[in-house]
Amino acid sequence: MNIYAVGGAIRDELLGVPVQDRDYVVVGATPEQMIAQGFRPVGKDFPVFLHPDTHEEYALARTERKTAAGYHGFQFHYAPDVTLDEDLARRDLTINAMAREVSPDGTLIGPVIDPFDGQRDLRARVFRHVSDAFVEDPVRILRLARFAARFADFTVADDTLALMRRMVDAGEVDALVPERVWQELARGLMEAKPSRMFAVLRDCGALARILPEVDGLWGVPQRADYHPEVDTGVHVMMVVDYAAKQRYSLPVRFAALTHDLGKATTPDDVLPRHTGHEGRSVDLLKPLCERLRVPNECRDLALVVAREHGNLHRVMEMGAAALVRFFERTDALRKPARFAEMLQACEADARGRLGLEAQPYPQAERLRVALAAARSVDAGAIARATGSDSAKIKDAVHRARIEAVAHALEIGE
C-alpha cells in the first residue's frame, strides 16, 4: 500500500500559496484493508475513506469510463493493480494531475510525480487538459472557469478551449443539474477575479447555455456620460470584480452580477437609454433564481438591488419622507443587515465604471445615518401612547420616523 497527496495540494505548494486541504490516493489496497486499518468508508460511487485520526479523505486509486450523458454518467473501476499514473490520467487539468508520496507520519517525501507536465504548465500559466477524456465530464468546464477566477493570470490552452467548445456544441453542458451549476458559479464568484470565470465561459459558449441572461449583456450600449465603459457586459464584470476586491459576501456578489439584467432587453430604438430596466431585471431574475435553485439569501438581496439600485443612487435628492418610504419599501427597518449589503452592492455598481473606481459615494453614509435615525424611534412607546387603533399607530410611527430622519440629516420633510 502506497499513499500519495494529489491534485490541488501539490499545485498550490508549487505556486507558493497556502494549501487549504489535501486529497489522498491509496495505491495497492482493497476496501477491506482500509477498514482493517481503522479508516471509515464514506464514498457512495467509489471507495473513499476518512482517516481515523485526521478525518481527511483517502480514495482508492481508480479509473473511470463514460457510460451516459452528464456528469453522473460514469462507471468506476478500482482495484489494487490500478496505478498512480492511471489515477492521475482521469483528472481534468495537468496542473491538478501531480502527486507526492506520503510517509507513514504524514509528511510529503520524494519528488513531484508529474506524468503530464503539470509543472511546465504552471510555469507557463496555462490551463491544459490531461487527455481527450476531458470532454466526458461537463463539470470540468465550470471548474476550469472557476480556476480562471482564482488564478487570473492563467490562460486556456487553444486545444483545451476547442474541446470545451465541442462539449458545449454537443449539449453536454445542458445535462448539468442546477445545483451543480450554482455550486460552481458561487465558488467562482467568491474567487479574487470573478470576471475571468465569465470570460472563459463566454469564450467556449457555455455562458449562453447556463446564464443566457448574463451572456446577453455584452454588446448592449449604455450612455457614456454615466458609463464611460459603454458596454453593459463590461460594466457588470467591473462591478463584480469591485465587490470581490472589497471581499463582499456571496449575496452581494450575486446581486452585483444580476443588477442590470434588464438592460439586455431594452428595445433597440431607445438605446443607449435604459428607462425601466430595473423592473425588467426583476422579471428576468426571478426565473433565473428558480432555475438554478439559488439560495434565498442570495435571491432576496439580488431582487431588491435589481429593483431599487436606481432609486438608491438618487437618495441625495430625497427628503425625509421619501427616505422613510424607501426604508419601508426595502424592508430596511426590519432587516438592517440586508440593507447594509444592498448599500455595498450599489456602491460597487457606482464604482464599477471606467475611470470612476474611486469616486465618492456619499449616498451610503446618508442612508446609514438616516436609517439609524428611523430605527431609533420607539414604536412600542408610540403604540402605548396612541391607543388601540392600528391605523393611527402606524401613521404616528411613520411620522415620528420622518421627523427623526429630518432632524438627523438637518433637512426638510
Swiss-Prot record:
One of its GO terms (molecular function) is tRNA binding. Residues 232-333 form the HD domain. It catalyses: a tRNA precursor + 2 CTP + ATP = a tRNA with a 3' CCA end + 3 diphosphate; a tRNA with a 3' CCA end + 2 CTP + ATP = a tRNA with a 3' CCACCA end + 3 diphosphate. SUPFAM superfamilies: Nucleotidyltransferase (SSF81301), Poly A polymerase C-terminal region-like (SSF81891). CTP binds at G8, R11, R91, R143, R146. GO terms for biological process: RNA repair; tRNA 3'-terminal CCA addition. ATP binds at G8, R11, R91, R143, R146. The keyword Hydrolase applies. Belongs to the tRNA nucleotidyltransferase/poly(A) polymerase family. Bacterial CCA-adding enzyme type 1 subfamily. Monomer. Can also form homodimers and oligomers. Comprises two domains: an N-terminal domain containing the nucleotidyltransferase activity and a C-terminal HD domain associated with both phosphodiesterase and phosphatase activities. A single active site specifically recognizes both ATP and CTP and is responsible for their addition. Catalyzes the addition and repair of the essential 3'-terminal CCA sequence in tRNAs without using a nucleic acid template. Adds these three nucleotides in the order of C, C, and A to the tRNA nucleotide-73, using CTP and ATP as substrates and producing inorganic pyrophosphate. tRNA 3'-terminal CCA addition is required both for tRNA processing and repair. Also involved in tRNA surveillance by mediating tandem CCA addition to generate a CCACCA at the 3' terminus of unstable tRNAs. While stable tRNAs receive only 3'-terminal CCA, unstable tRNAs are marked with CCACCA and rapidly degraded. This is Multifunctional CCA protein. It comes from Burkholderia multivorans (strain ATCC 17616 / 249). The gene is cca.
